[in-house]
Amino acid sequence: MLKSVERCLECKTDRSFGNHGTWWSMPCTGDIIQYFTYHGNVICRVNWTQKTVYLTNSGWDTRSTNRALNDYKHWFTENTDFEIIDKREN
Protein backbone atom coordinates (compact mmCIF):
# COMPACT_ATOMS: atom_id res chain seq x y z
CA MET A 1 0.00 0.00 0.00
CA LEU A 2 1.20 3.52 -0.77
CA LYS A 3 2.52 5.30 2.34
CA SER A 4 0.62 8.47 1.44
CA VAL A 5 -2.64 6.49 1.26
CA GLU A 6 -1.88 4.96 4.68
CA ARG A 7 -1.24 8.43 6.10
CA CYS A 8 -4.52 9.75 4.68
CA LEU A 9 -6.43 6.82 6.18
CA GLU A 10 -4.92 7.57 9.60
CA CYS A 11 -5.78 11.30 9.50
CA LYS A 12 -8.42 12.77 11.75
CA THR A 13 -8.01 16.28 10.29
CA ASP A 14 -7.76 17.83 6.82
CA ARG A 15 -4.28 17.08 5.49
CA SER A 16 -2.17 16.65 2.35
CA PHE A 17 0.72 14.29 1.69
CA GLY A 18 2.33 15.03 -1.65
CA ASN A 19 -0.29 14.44 -4.36
CA HIS A 20 -2.67 12.77 -1.90
CA GLY A 21 -4.98 14.47 0.57
CA THR A 22 -7.97 14.04 2.81
CA TRP A 23 -10.63 16.34 4.21
CA TRP A 24 -13.71 15.94 6.33
CA SER A 25 -17.26 17.27 5.99
CA MET A 26 -20.40 17.13 8.09
CA PRO A 27 -23.24 18.39 5.87
CA CYS A 28 -26.73 19.33 7.04
CA THR A 29 -27.73 15.66 6.93
CA GLY A 30 -25.51 14.93 9.92
CA ASP A 31 -23.47 12.37 7.99
CA ILE A 32 -19.73 12.29 8.62
CA ILE A 33 -18.00 12.21 5.24
CA GLN A 34 -14.30 11.90 4.50
CA TYR A 35 -12.93 12.71 1.05
CA PHE A 36 -9.67 11.37 -0.34
CA THR A 37 -8.03 13.24 -3.21
CA TYR A 38 -5.31 12.50 -5.72
CA HIS A 39 -3.82 15.42 -7.68
CA GLY A 40 -6.72 17.56 -6.42
CA ASN A 41 -9.46 15.22 -7.67
CA VAL A 42 -11.78 13.41 -5.27
CA ILE A 43 -11.26 9.71 -5.96
CA CYS A 44 -12.77 8.23 -2.79
CA ARG A 45 -15.68 9.43 -0.63
CA VAL A 46 -16.42 7.62 2.62
CA ASN A 47 -19.67 8.12 4.48
CA TRP A 48 -18.80 6.96 7.99
CA THR A 49 -22.44 7.29 9.09
CA GLN A 50 -24.02 5.23 6.30
CA LYS A 51 -20.97 2.95 5.99
CA THR A 52 -20.43 3.41 2.26
CA VAL A 53 -17.27 3.89 0.19
CA TYR A 54 -17.66 5.50 -3.25
CA LEU A 55 -14.69 5.09 -5.60
CA THR A 56 -14.21 7.05 -8.83
CA ASN A 57 -11.22 7.81 -11.01
CA SER A 58 -12.74 11.21 -11.88
CA GLY A 59 -12.13 10.47 -15.55
CA TRP A 60 -8.41 9.78 -15.01
CA ASP A 61 -8.01 6.16 -16.09
CA THR A 62 -4.31 5.98 -15.24
CA ARG A 63 -2.30 3.27 -13.51
CA SER A 64 -1.35 5.59 -10.65
CA THR A 65 -4.97 6.62 -10.00
CA ASN A 66 -6.14 3.02 -10.15
CA ARG A 67 -3.36 1.96 -7.79
CA ALA A 68 -4.51 4.51 -5.20
CA LEU A 69 -8.14 3.41 -5.68
CA ASN A 70 -7.19 -0.24 -5.28
CA ASP A 71 -5.36 0.61 -2.04
CA TYR A 72 -8.44 2.38 -0.63
CA LYS A 73 -10.71 -0.45 -1.75
CA HIS A 74 -8.41 -3.07 -0.22
CA TRP A 75 -8.17 -1.21 3.11
CA PHE A 76 -11.93 -0.74 3.48
CA THR A 77 -12.65 -4.33 2.38
CA GLU A 78 -10.16 -5.78 4.87
CA ASN A 79 -10.87 -3.47 7.82
CA THR A 80 -14.58 -2.59 7.65
CA ASP A 81 -17.93 -3.99 6.59
CA PHE A 82 -18.69 -0.88 4.51
CA GLU A 83 -20.50 -1.18 1.17
CA ILE A 84 -18.06 -0.52 -1.70
CA ILE A 85 -19.48 1.37 -4.70
CA ASP A 86 -16.90 1.29 -7.50
CA LYS A 87 -17.77 3.77 -10.28
CA ARG A 88 -14.51 3.93 -12.22
CA GLU A 89 -14.79 5.27 -15.75
CA ASN A 90 -12.90 3.59 -18.57
Spans of model-derived segments:
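Terminal leader/tail segments of proteins
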Residues: 1-90
